[in-house]
Amino acid sequence: MARTASFDRDAVVRAAMDAFWTTGYEGAGIADLERATGLRRSSIYNSFGSKRGLFDAAVEQYLDDVIRPRLEPLTAAPVSPDAVIGYLAGLRDAFADPASLAARSGCMLINTAGAPIGEDSAVAASVSAYRDELRAALKRGITARLPHLDPGAADRLADACTGQVVAALALARIDRSSATAAVDTALALIAAA
């Protein structure tokens, strides 16, 4: 008879999320995940099927705990005209603070896109879906702030701002000042529109 798992699944997934976020999928070995989660290898495999299964759960947790709460002011109805500026300013502040996880580790999904695991079709689809979610949120914020823009101009501005945010997220762990400058560029693009 199989034993029932006796651990807090959410706490385990969050601990794994932190490990993957900090060191990446390839950098987090099973021994590292055992230390981070407090589970033994057999429990990881029995509960999640594989290291990859735990990673997939960690990605979903990252979206739910980190990404969607930050995007919520841009996705809730109605969107405040100040929401997009608030989002970008918050991102800029996070990059400027050397103690913040965003400044030290960047974005778990953007980091994953540039790693070997990013070539996996399911992982690539998750990263692409995140980028689409980010773009849609930024477009809603841009439209709320600049209702006079025609739809094509709003689309182009959303594309440009999304590119700047993705660049900032990719740069955060290696060059915080460049990450901050990329966010400043997005803010300047909105101010100029």
List the predicted regions and their residue ranges:
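Generic hydrophobic, amphipathic alpha-helix propensity
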Residues: 8-17, 33, 58-62, 66, ...
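Amphipathic alpha-helical packing segments from all-alpha helical-bundle domains
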Residues: 82-86, 104-107, 119-146, 156, ...
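C-terminal peripheral helix-coil segments that are non-catalytic and often amphipathic
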Residues: 90-94, 132-144, 148-151, 155, ...
